[in-house]
């Protein structure tokens, strides 16, 4: 349910200004497909309405099937129209989706561009986000090894509590940070091999280490303000081999 997902988003410190649902774009999707058909952007084929992508060097895809039902492709132009309407003049709409949908977006972007070049040309981008793998391999619903984000964070939290003496609240904060940073530190087109032990390591490229470093730096800065030091150093009296950049750091 939406309530369940909203609870998850709150736990991850995530927020969405607007959620779009597929059912919103059924009727408008068919209307736009018919408009595109009249303009010659789409064409009929074996009872369906398709986009022939050959002349553009991209795939041919179905927008309305032979039963008269819009496909995902058929509803996408209606979604784009709504997004550009809801948020006004946009510089770029970024779709963060797996690489398997590359063909889908190439086709729908092209159709939308042909419908309204001024509005859509070069205004949309498919940001490929690769799959996540655990040590057991790639997650797959077909193989039954899909895991939920909440489960993953809970497992990370358990490990943190096992290895440290922190309280429940601190463990929760570290677990969320460790999980999120493990995703963010990788390039979007790199398959993520999630390792719980690596994610909570107190050294190296991990959230706990970065948080620790930040806290230590804050502590040093706080203590330095209490020290009675001269605001300037008479460098002419200091005999050293330090260069100007090094002296500026001092």
Which sequence ranges carry the predicted segments?
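Non-catalytic interaction-recognition regions
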Residues: 1-250
């Amino acid at each position: 349910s939406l309530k369940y997902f909203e609870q998850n988003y709150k736990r991850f410190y995530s927020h969405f200004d607007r959620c779009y649902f597929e059912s919103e774009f059924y009727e408008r999707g068919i209307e736009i497909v018919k408009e595109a058909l009249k303009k010659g952007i789409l064409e009929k084929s074996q009872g369906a309405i398709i986009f022939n992508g050959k002349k553009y060097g991209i795939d041919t895809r179905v927008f309305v099937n032979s039963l008269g039902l819009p496909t995902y492709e058929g509803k996408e132009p209606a979604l784009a129209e709504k997004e550009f309407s809801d948020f006004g003049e946009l510089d770029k709409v970024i779709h963060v989706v797996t690489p398997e949908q590359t063909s889908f977006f190439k086709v729908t972007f092209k159709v939308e561009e042909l419908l309204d070049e001024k509005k859509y040309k070069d205004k949309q981008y498919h940001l490929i986000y690769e799959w996540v793998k655990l040590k057991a391999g790639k997650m797959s619903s077909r193989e039954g090894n899909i895991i939920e984000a909440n489960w993953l964070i809970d497992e990370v939290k358990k490990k943190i509590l096992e290895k440290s003496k922190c309280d429940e609240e601190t463990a929760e904060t570290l677990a969320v940070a460790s999980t999120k940073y493990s995703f963010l530190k990788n390039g979007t087109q790199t398959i993520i091999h999630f390792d719980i032990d690596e994610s909570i390591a107190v050294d190296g490229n991990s959230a706990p280490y970065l948080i620790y470093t930040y806290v230590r730096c804050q502590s040093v800065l706080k203590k330095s303000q209490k020290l009675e030091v001269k605001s300037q150093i008479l460098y002419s009296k200091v005999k050293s081999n330090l260069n100007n950049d090094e002296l500026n750091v001092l």
